[in-house]
Structures are given as C-alpha cells and as structure tokens.
Amino acid sequence: MDEIKPKKEENSKRRRNVKPICRETGDHVHYLPTCKTKPKPTRTHHAPPPILDSIFKVTHKPHYYECRKNHAADIGTTAYDGCGEFVSSTGEEDSLNCAACGCHRNFHREELIPENGGVTETVLEVLKISSCQFRRIFCSPYGGGKSEGKKKKKEKESYGGDPIIKDRFGGAEEEEGIVKRLKTKFTAEQTEKMRDYAEKLRWKVRPERQEEVEEFCVEIGVNRKNFRIWMNNHKDKIIIDE
C-alpha cells in the first residue's frame, strides 16, 4: 500500500505537466501567458465656457431698511414700531440687533445694493479668461464680421435695357464679386411691338430666324436676351387670356 501511494502521486504530477495536443496537427499547444490589460484612461469633461455673468462678477452689499416685526400679532392685529432703518448696535456690519428698535436684523427689509452705492452703476470684477474662451463668447459665430449694411440693395432704375449692370467705379461690391441684377422695364410702345412680333413668331424663336430677331431688337432698342426672356414669361399668360 505504501508503494502504491508514491506511484499515484507521480502519475498525478505527470498529468499536470502534460501539455495538451492539438487534434488537427498533433502538436503540443502552448498557452500564452495572460497579462492584465490596463484600464483605459477616462477623459475628463471640461466645463462649458463661462457666460458673461461669470466673466463680469457683480458684487453687492446687503442693506436693511424699515422693521417689519408685528408687535400686535398676539391679539390678531398689525402694529409696527416705526423703525425706518436698521442701525447696528455695536457699530459693526456683522451686528444682528438694531440699536433703534432692538429687533433682530431679519425683521428688517433687506435689499442688495452695489458696493459703490449707485443705482445704475455696478462694480465689475474682470476675471481672467483664455483667448479661446474670449473668441467663443465675443466673436461672431459665422466668421464674417461684416455689417448688414453691405447687403445687396435693390435698385429700381432702368439703364438702356441692359439686364445686368455692374459697378464700374471700383466699389466694394465689385471687389467682392457681387453683380447687381436689375429688373428690366419696357415702355408701352416696346411692349406692344414685342407682343405683335411674338405672335408673328408664334411665341417661339427658331434658329433660321435668329438674324431677323436680332434686327427687330436693335430696331426697338431692346436686348435680344431680354426679348426672349419676356416672350417666355408672357407666352402662357397671353395664351390663357385669349
């Protein structure tokens, strides 16, 4: 029995040391040493940029006025002692009792007043802010920085029948590449002639009649492109009216 026990212990040790064999290749399987993964660092969420109230800190000072203690509350009526303003009994700001009426400071009406004593003026303490926070708060979010006065202005003038008029005097709008497009106006005589000629063309300009249309436009003083635009805009309207 004593010899059997050491044999069993040797067999159990061998089984522990035996490495597993892969069924497909027949090789011993080597396990890689397990390593503990390091936890990912957590990102700290920064607070949003401060608003104007935090940039300009307004400091106030409490001031106590008339006493509102009801001395006749026990008998069901109202009676005040007539004290119009809290007076410190010790001459210090931290005093809690009024020297005039003897009541506690909480019975007096409290009002916050700026430290400089003014009504409209306030004491502003400018806090330190970074340049990035300054841009977020004070700079334009659209990145333009241009005033609204530089927008396109609508003009109601007609200039020789040309549909597009550019600023030829080196204005700001020409530098920015802005082209003013004006609405072309025609006289009653031009409108009547264009209508008669459009009916003659059956409201369509064919390629073989391009030169004829050009001569007609020069004769009445209208740009050929304007005439075609006018004809396309009024073709359906005139046909419906008829």
Curated annotation (Swiss-Prot):
Residues 155-166 have a biased composition (Basic and acidic residues). A zinc finger (ZF-HD dimerization-type) spans 64-111. Pfam families: ZF-HD_dimer. Keywords: DNA-binding, Homeobox, Metal-binding, Nucleus, Transcription, Transcription regulation, Zinc, Zinc-finger. Residues 144-166 are annotated as: Disordered. Putative transcription factor. It is found in: Nucleus. Homo- and heterodimer with other ZFHD proteins. Interacts with MIF1, MIF2 and MIF3; these interactions prevent nuclear localization and DNA-binding to inhibit transcription regulation activity. Binds to ZHD11. It comes from Arabidopsis thaliana (Mouse-ear cress). Residues 179-238 bind DNA. InterPro entries: Homeodomain-like_sf (IPR009057), Homeodomain_ZF_HD (IPR006455), ZF_HD_homeobox_Cys/His_dimer (IPR006456). The record marks 231 as: Required for DNA-binding. The homeodomain differs form the typical one by having namely 4 instead of 3 extra amino acids inserted in the loop between helix 1 and helix 2. Its main location: nucleus. Mostly expressed in flowers. The gene is ZHD13. One of its GO terms (cellular component) is nucleus. This is Zinc-finger homeodomain protein 13.
